[in-house]
Amino acid sequence: MPKTSKDVIEFAKKNNILFYDFRFTDIKGIWHHVSYHADSVSEDILKGVPFDGSSIAAWQPINQSDMLLIPDLDSLFIDPFTADPTLVVFCDVYDIYKKQPYEKDPRSIAKKALKYLAESGIGDAAYFGPENEFFIFDDLKIKDEINAQSYEIDSTEGVWRS
C-alpha cells in the first residue's frame, strides 16, 4: 500500500480512481464522509482535509467549526461497491484551535486508551468494535385504514412473554 501522499496520488492514477472518499465517525458511531474528485486532490490535501465540524451533531459551535481530517494512509482501499472507482481513506479528526487530535473523535479516543493501556501495564491488547443490537419479531400486524392506523408486534423475547 502507498505510504506517502505522492504514492497515494500515483496509486490512484494507476487504478483510474475518479473520487477520493475521506471517512470518519462521530461520537455516536455514525459514518460521515467528504468526497473529492480525483482531479482536485493534491499531495497537500492528503495532509489534512478541511471540513465544517458544526455540521456534525454535538461537535463544534459555528464560531469554531473549522476542522481537519487527517488521512490514515494505512487504511485506504478501493471501494468495490461504488459505480465510479473510489479510493476510501479513513481519517482522524484534528482540532485546529487546540492543535491536537479532537477529543470527540472515536479514533482519537481509542488511540488514547491504547496508549494508557501500554503505559500503565494493565493489559496487552484492547479490542474495539461496534455492538450490533437488534430484535427478532415473531409476528407483525399492521392496520392502515382511512380512519385508523396501528401495529402489533409479537416476539418470544418480549417482556410480556416472561
Regions found by a protein language model. Name each.
Residues 1-162:
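Glycine-rich, acidic/polar active-site loops that bind/position phosphate-bearing ligands
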